[in-house]
Amino acid sequence: VDFGSIESFPLNKFEKIMDLNVKSVFSCIQEAIKMMKSDGDEGKIITIGSIASKWTGRGGDGSYSASKYAVYGMIESIARQLHGSGSNIAVGLICPGVVDTTLTNPDKDQKPNWMRPTTIADSVLHMVTAPKNVNIFDLTIFGMDEKPW
């Protein structure tokens, strides 16, 4: 992820981040809803967002935070739209903090307190296996040594 100040951050990089983090989510959810509506109008859509959608402005990550904030707003709007129309499609969002992956930790140094990808997978499983009459909309998780606020 590119980080930079607003004065020097190139517009084309900002657009690339928005395409990757917002437009792609919109396209996937749009198609998922079409498929679910044609197959009984029920199901669960779980989106992976970021803790950056909630605790924004941590220095030079404005474009990334803005994209994740947009995803949060979009998911909330879609959830309200579906619920308001009487649909049985539930929409949820997981907002993780730092996860130990090759993207966040390219040197593969041992980060004992960072979340593992399996933590996120377990969270998805928790959301999708909730009873049909329960929708877990927002699940924010982060490592104990992460200071998001």
What are these regions (language model features)?
Residues F9, T56-S65, S77, D107:
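Active-site loop-to-helix junction immediately N-terminal to the catalytic Tyr of the SDR YXXXK motif
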Residues G4-I6, P10-E15:
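Substrate-binding pocket helix/loop in short-chain dehydrogenase/reductase
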Residues I29, S67:
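Active-site helix of classical SDR
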Residues S50:
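Residue(s) in the substrate-gating loop at a strand-loop-helix junction
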Residues I89, L93-I94, D109-W149:
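C-terminal helical subdomain
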Residues W55-T56, S77-I89:
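Active-site-adjacent segment of SDR/Rossmann-fold oxidoreductases
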Residues E31-D41, S85:
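A short helix-coil junction within the Rossmann-fold of NAD(P)-dependent oxidoreductases
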